[in-house]
């Protein structure tokens, strides 16, 4: 499925890694969310998303391909019927990884990987994109007339724009140290 990674594998050998990923994917599709280590969750995510993409196709060849990887027919049936219909309108991003802290025994970083089954409303996505575009266009529209106005006033007085430039430079100088202090405070809070 996904291209193999270089370096150490999960569980030792490549065959064991394939079996571990298949079992993790089967557990994910059966329970809709599982708790595992962050490393395993990151390796499982593209594997599971590829299987969901096959399930969305829904044809016999895709079903047989998934059955070659996940041997549990009940889980494959659930993947092709329930999960594929739930993510039908989603164009990817079928899984979500949430870090939950370290395991008590060996302090391994743990994560919850879950299927994203919430419905996607195409209308809401279009509205969100339109509002973002409008928000970006509004400041640009305000800056354009402001630039034209000083050009017209230059003929009358040349000292006024120079005073405005120094005022904007001072304001920018005051904002720059404040911006540098904010990340330092965030690092201290963590």
UniProtKB/Swiss-Prot annotation:
<comment type="subunit">
    <text>Part of the 50S ribosomal subunit. Contacts protein L32.</text>
</comment>
<feature type="region of interest" description="Disordered">
    <location>
        <begin position="135"/>
        <end position="190"/>
    </location>
</feature>
<keyword id="KW-0687">Ribonucleoprotein</keyword>
<dbReference type="GO" id="GO:0022625">
    <property type="term" value="C:cytosolic large ribosomal subunit"/>
</dbReference>
<dbReference type="GO" id="GO:0003735">
    <property type="term" value="F:structural constituent of ribosome"/>
</dbReference>
<dbReference type="InterPro" id="IPR047859">
    <property type="entry name" value="Ribosomal_bL17_CS"/>
</dbReference>
<dbReference type="InterPro" id="IPR036373">
    <property type="entry name" value="Ribosomal_bL17_sf"/>
</dbReference>
<dbReference type="Pfam" id="PF01196">
    <property type="entry name" value="Ribosomal_L17"/>
</dbReference>
<keyword id="KW-0689">Ribosomal protein</keyword>
<feature type="compositionally biased region" description="Low complexity">
    <location>
        <begin position="135"/>
        <end position="165"/>
    </location>
</feature>
<dbReference type="GO" id="GO:0006412">
    <property type="term" value="P:translation"/>
</dbReference>
<protein>
    <recommendedName>
        <fullName>Large ribosomal subunit protein bL17</fullName>
    </recommendedName>
</protein>
<comment type="similarity">
    <text>Belongs to the bacterial ribosomal protein bL17 family.</text>
</comment>
<dbReference type="InterPro" id="IPR000456">
    <property type="entry name" value="Ribosomal_bL17"/>
</dbReference>
């Amino acid at each position: 499925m996904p291209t193999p990674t270089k370096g150490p594998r999960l569980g030792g050998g490549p065959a064991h890694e394939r079996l571990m990923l298949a079992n993790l994917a089967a557990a994910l599709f059966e329970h809709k969310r599982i708790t595992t280590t962050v490393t395993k969750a990151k390796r499982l995510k593209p594997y599971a998303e590829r299987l969901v993409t096959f399930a969305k196709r829904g044809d016999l060849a895709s079903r047989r391909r998934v059955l070659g990887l996940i041997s549990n027919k009940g889980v494959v049936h659930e993947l092709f019927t329930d999960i594929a219909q739930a993510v039908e309108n989603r164009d990817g991003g079928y899984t979500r990884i949430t870090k939950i802290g370290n395991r008590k025994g060996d302090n391994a970083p743990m994560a919850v990987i879950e299927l994203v089954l919430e419905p996607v409303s195409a209308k809401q996505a279009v509205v969100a994109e339109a509002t973002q575009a409008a928000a970006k266009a509004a400041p640009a529209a305000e800056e354009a007339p402001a630039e034209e106005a000083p050009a017209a006033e230059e003929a009358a007085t040349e000292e006024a724009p120079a005073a405005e430039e120094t005022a904007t430079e001072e304001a920018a100088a005051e904002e720059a140290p404040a911006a540098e202090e904010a990340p330092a405070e965030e690092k201290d809070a963590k």
